[in-house]
Every structure is written in C-alpha cells, then in structure tokens.
Amino acid sequence: MSERLLVLVRHGQSEWNLKNLFTGWKDPDLTELGVTEAKDAGRKLKEQGFAFDIAFTSVLIRAEHTLDLVLEELGQTGIPVRKDLALNERDYGDLAGLNKDEARKKWGEEQVLIWRRSYDVPPPGGESLKDTLARTLPYFVQEILPCVLRGECTLVAAHGNSLRALVMVLEKLSPEQILKRELATGAPVIYRLNADATVASKLDLAA
C-alpha cells in the first residue's frame, strides 16, 4: 500500500493581501512575492521528492495560479486537477474590497474584530468561519480524503479559512483552537495519514 500523503498549501500573497483588503470571493491575482512564494513551495516539495497523483484547488485565481506554479516547479503539470468553489475562501460579504482600517472606521474596531475572529458570527452578507467549514468539510470528506486513503499523493492549494476546515478535522481541533491557527502563505504542510484517516505525522515546511 502506498503512503497516504496529503499536502496543503495556502496561496501566495495576493494583490489584496498586500493592500490589506478583505478579499473573500473577490478574485485578485498573486503579487510578485506571491509568485515567488508559490515557486518556493514547489521547490521545497521537489526537494522532499514528492510525485503527486491528483490536485485540488478553488475557483479563485490566486489559488489556481499558486497550484500551477507549484506543479510547474515540480515538473508535474500533467496530473488531474479538480477545481471547486467548495474550497473558496470565506465570503466576507460587505467587507470584501474594503481596507481593514476603512472597515474599522465604518463599523468600529470591536465589531470588525468579532466578524474576523469569532467562529459563528458572519459579516453582513457573508460567511462565518462555521459557514465556511460547513461548505468545505463535506467536499473534503467526500472528494479529497478518499483519494488520500487510496494511496494517491494529494495536493490541495486553497485559502487560509478553507484550509482551516481541513486542518480542523485532520488535527481534531476545537473552534477555539482553529481560530488561533494561522497558515503562512505559500508554506506546504505535509500530513501522513493512517488507514483510519488519523494523522500519523505532520511536517510544516514554512520558511
């Protein structure tokens, strides 16, 4: 039986990350730094000897572009790639496109902090982290996890909050714990799973 390997990569820095804007389902591309981060992720995975069988990403360009750059660096652009909005970033609703300082002026520091850091309070017209998990987790369990458990080396390039859903179930974290978990841009996290989908080992390739 092949190893059950799952690699998660948060997209590289986007143009809106750089401008400190709420992004969500808006669709900015990577910055030059983001491109470099994605290529570095591919290089690190190449150094580890990874040969992927399948990859998953969202339908947002910053994640798709990150995946493309990682696979190019690996020389593995021919593998099957599945794209699904289930892996999209949390939808920030009315906050999307606003500078975080502008949002604080409009709604107040405390309210914006609640929207950003609470588990189940959504911003106007948007999703809470709980809502995002409800969208992302079924896709992970039904589509991604079976590939890993079959022994297919699996790569997921997505977003800070959609990847939190995967980390939450893999590491059996509470809502309070997952809220505190930060995923660095362009930093691969490698999970080796047991046959029952529990984590045998984890390796974070940040920096």
Swiss-Prot record:
Pathway named in the protein's UniProt entry: Carbohydrate degradation; glycolysis; pyruvate from D-glyceraldehyde 3-phosphate: step 3/5
One Pfam family per UniProt: His_Phos_1
Catalyzed chemical reaction(s): (2R)-2-phosphoglycerate = (2R)-3-phosphoglycerate
Gene Ontology MF, one: phosphoglycerate mutase activity
Quaternary structure (record): Homodimer.
Domain of life: Bacteria
Marked site (Transition state stabilizer) residue numbers: 159
Lineage, uppermost ranks: Bacteria, Pseudomonadati, Pseudomonadota, Alphaproteobacteria, Hyphomicrobiales
InterPro entries recorded: His_Pase_superF_clade-1, His_PPase_superfam, PG/BPGM_mutase_AS, Phosphogly_mut1
Record family assignment: Belongs to the phosphoglycerate mutase family. BPG-dependent PGAM subfamily.
Residue spans crossing the bilayer: none
Disulfide bridge partners, by residue number: none
Keywords: Gluconeogenesis, Glycolysis, Isomerase
Role description: Catalyzes the interconversion of 2-phosphoglycerate and 3-phosphoglycerate.
EC number(s) recorded for this UniProt protein: 5.4.2.11
Annotated active site: 11, 89
Gene Ontology biological process: gluconeogenesis; glycolytic process
Stated name of the protein: 2,3-bisphosphoglycerate-dependent phosphoglycerate mutase
